[in-house]
C-alpha cells in the first residue's frame, strides 16, 4: 500500500469533495443545498467547497489530514440539479457520514451544516432546502415529549381538530385581566388559550402572577364545562435556570402544558425542556418566533421544512406551521409537506411539495400542527380540510375581536363542529363552506355576527418563497 506524504499548498475542493459516483449510505445524513455561486466559480467547485467547509475541509492542505481517515469523515457532493425556472442557482446534494455528528444533538448538526459555510465567499447565497436523517440518527434523539395520541388521551378529545386562542392584546394586560380573557374563551368552547410568544415576565405582568390567574381561569372553565382545558404558559426565560424554575411552578399548580420559543430560546434549551416535560408528564407547545428571519429568503437561509425536522428531533408536542389562508407566509403544497414531516411516521420524497428525500421517523411520535395567524370563522372549512384532525386551530384576533367580546369562542366551536359533521357526511368543505357556515349560523347568533364582521377580510398576497417545480 502506498504511503501518503504531506505536500503543502492549495488544491481545488473538487479534487477531494466532488464525487458524482458516490452512492449514499443508509446511515448518511443527506442535505440538499440551493447554491448561488459567485461569478467565475463553476458548479462542481462551489458544491465541493460547501461539502468541505461544512464537514472536515479547510482552504488549504494541512499535515494533520494524514492523522485521520479523511476519506471516511469528509462530506461528499454527489449530485447537482437545475432549479426549475431559475438559472442563477442550482441544487447540490451532499452526503455526510453519521459519525461527524454527536448523537442526539441537533445543535451539533446545525453547527456544521449551517455554520461558517454560510459566510463562505465562494458562494453568493446558500440555502439549506432539506435534510434526510437516517433512522440510526433519529433513534438517538428524544423527539416530542408525548406526541399526538398521548395528548388526546390526556385531554380525552378525539375525532376533531383542537381549538385555541392567543390572548390579545399580546402585551399590556394585567395578570388579572389576562386571566379573565382566558376564562371567557375557555368557557365559550375552546380547548386551549395561549400566551403570545413575546409574553415572558414584563413589568406589567410578572410570570408568576400570570400563571396563577390563568390556572384559576382554566380550572373554573373545566368545572363549568366538564371538559379538559389548558393554557400554554410560556416559560421562555433569560436563562435555562429561570426557564426550569417557571416550568416547575407550572407543574406545581397543575398546568397540563407549557410553551417555549424554540428558535429564540435556543435548540439546546429546547431539547432540555422537552426532556423535562417527558419526565414530568407535561405537554410542550412550541412557537416558531424568528423563523422568517431564517427561512423567508428563497435563496439564502434554511427552509422551514428543515426547521420542522429539527424541532421534531429536538422535542415538541405542538409546532406553529402557518395557515395557508391567513396572514402569514406559506403556500399550500409546501405547508402540507412540512405538516406531514411533523406528524407522519414515514414521508416519501415528493418534489411537488418540496420534499427532496424519503424521511423515516421510525417509532418517534409526531406532533400537532398549529394553524395560527390572521384566521377567522370564514377560514374554518379550508382549515379543517388542509390540517385534518391532528391540529390546533389557533384564533387570536379571530376570537377576541368579536363584537360581543369572547362570544366568538362559541362561534368558532359551532363552526368547527359543523365542518366536522359535514365532512363525516362526505360533503366538500371548501366548495360548500359558505352554505355550511350559513346553516350553522341560523342556530348561533354568535357565529352569524362573526361572519358579518369578517366577511370582507382576506390576506391575498403573493407568497415570497415559491416551490420550484419543473413543468410537465
Swiss-Prot record:
Keywords linked to the UniProt accession: Calvin cycle, Carbon dioxide fixation, Lyase, Magnesium, Metal-binding, Monooxygenase, Oxidoreductase, Photosynthesis
Catalytic activity: 2 (2R)-3-phosphoglycerate + 2 H(+) = D-ribulose 1,5-bisphosphate + CO2 + H2O; D-ribulose 1,5-bisphosphate + O2 = 2-phosphoglycolate + (2R)-3-phosphoglycerate + 2 H(+)
Co-factor binding comment: Binds 1 Mg(2+) ion per subunit.
Modified residues annotated as N6-carboxylysine in this record: 194
GO molecular function per UniProt: magnesium ion binding; monooxygenase activity; ribulose-bisphosphate carboxylase activity
Annotated binding of Mg(2+), by residue: 194, 196-197
Gene3D superfamilies for this protein: Ribulose bisphosphate carboxylase, large subunit, C-terminal domain, RuBisCO large subunit, N-terminal domain
Alphabetical list of InterPro entries matching this protein: RuBisCO, RuBisCo_large_chain_AS, RuBisCO_lsu_C, RuBisCO_lsu_C_sf, RuBisCO_lsu_fd_N, RuBisCO_lsu_N_sf, RuBisCO_lsuI
Additional facts recorded: The basic functional RuBisCO is composed of a large chain homodimer in a 'head-to-tail' conformation. In form I RuBisCO this homodimer is arranged in a barrel-like tetramer with the small subunits forming a tetrameric 'cap' on each end of the 'barrel'.
Subunit structure: Heterohexadecamer of 8 large chains and 8 small chains.
Name listed for the protein in its UniProt record: Ribulose bisphosphate carboxylase large chain
Organism: Nitrobacter vulgaris
Gene: cbbL
